[in-house]
């Protein structure tokens, strides 16, 4: 997944991230069921606040483009995974 933020954009960071992920899902660059990086990992990669990524993911989830799965890691700690929605064969 490739996300590029534009410093001169009038759109907030979360909107830029949401729009780019949405575009990649719709043009099939991101495949159905493909895992997305955690909000923390993507925020670190883009050097932005994790809340910006969480908001973008929340909005994508509300649009039905991604799904959120909760589970536990191998140590039993809670873990949340985000994936491109399976039903997203548009």
Predicted feature locations:
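N-terminal helix-turn-helix
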Residues: 35-68
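HTH-adjacent hinge/linker in prokaryotic transcriptional regulators
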Residues: 58, 62-90
